């Protein structure tokens, strides 16, 4: 089910971006060559909210949780930019023997490189209405309020699951990558749609994964992007 949701999100983002690129190709007189105009670096801030899905052993809807993100960065060339993002809110998962659902909170910080895919394919043009960006980066996350899992262990003395249970506040490394679609509304304002996959160490969800693998969190977010100095 999750694969279908992710594929649908990606197809929507890629489809809208493809229409934009096709339109630019169909009207070469409107297309700006990547070296034809002076480029000015641009700072921006983004505020987004939406839903997160934690990869786990329950139905898709059971593992949905709220998510939010705030970021700031700079577009420093026609193709590349960089940003610092703070994201997170809540993550959910399930333990099956005995069966119970649990949640915890986290905040992730990451430094990311952003590639303007539309400009790479169709040439840079100032004021483009629709653009697709690819981003990737890494940083650290802090988990806290892991109350449900600790309560389950405390209330069941014979329960020996959740082998990687943590208490209090815990720090993790974190990485993520994804796609971002910008729909320009005004000179300094855009609607931003973002889908990303985040990776964490195996103890992020307090339990042992298959082959001590990684824990995954997927986000679908929507919000506003403000360009500064335009």
Regions found by a protein language model. Give the residues of each.
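Cleavable N-terminal export/targeting peptides
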Residues: 1-39, 229-230
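Short glycine/proline- and aromatic-enriched beta-strand/turn motifs that initiate or cap beta-hairpins
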Residues: 21-73, 145
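Extracytoplasmic loops and strand-loop junctions of Gram-negative outer membrane beta-barrel proteins
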Residues: 28-29, 53-55, 157-165, 205-207
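Short loop/turn motifs that connect adjacent beta-strands in outer-membrane beta-barrel proteins
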Residues: 31-42, 79, 118-132, 185-188, ...
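Residues that define the transmembrane beta-barrel architecture of outer-membrane proteins
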Residues: 41, 62-68, 105-109, 130, ...
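Residues on the lipid-exposed face of transmembrane beta-strands in outer-membrane beta-barrel proteins
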Residues: 47-51, 70-74, 111-117, 136-140, ...
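Gram-negative (and chloroplast) outer-membrane scaffold detector with strong preference
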Residues: 78-157, 226
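Predominantly the C-terminal beta-signal and adjacent terminal strand-loop region
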Residues: 91-99, 104-106, 184-230
């Amino acid at each position: 089910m999750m694969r279908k949701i992710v594929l649908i999100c990606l197809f929507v983002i890629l489809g809208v971006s493809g229409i934009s690129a096709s339109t630019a190709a169909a009207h070469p007189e409107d297309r700006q060559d990547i070296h034809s105009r002076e480029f000015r670096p641009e700072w921006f801030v983004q505020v987004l909210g939406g839903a997160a899905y934690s990869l786990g052993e329950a139905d898709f809807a059971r593992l949905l949780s709220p998510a939010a993100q705030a970021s700031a960065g700079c577009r420093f060339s026609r193709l590349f930019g960089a940003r610092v993002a703070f994201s997170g809110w809540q993550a959910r998962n399930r333990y099956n023997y005995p069966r119970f659902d649990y949640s915890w909170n986290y905040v992730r910080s990451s430094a990311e490189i952003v590639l303007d895919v539309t400009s790479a394919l169709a040439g840079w043009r100032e004021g483009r209405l629709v653009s697709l960006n690819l981003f990737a980066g890494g940083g650290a996350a802090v988990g806290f309020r892991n109350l449900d899992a600790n309560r389950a262990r405390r209330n069941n003395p014979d329960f020996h699951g959740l082998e990687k249970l943590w208490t209090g506040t815990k720090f993790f490394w974190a990485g993520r990558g994804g796609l971002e679609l910008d729909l320009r509304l005004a000179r300094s304002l855009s609607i931003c749609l973002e889908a990303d996959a985040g990776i964490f160490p195996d103890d992020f969800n307090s339990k042992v994964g298959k082959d001590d693998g990684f824990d995954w969190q997927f986000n679908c977010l929507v919000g506003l992007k403000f360009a500064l100095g335009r």
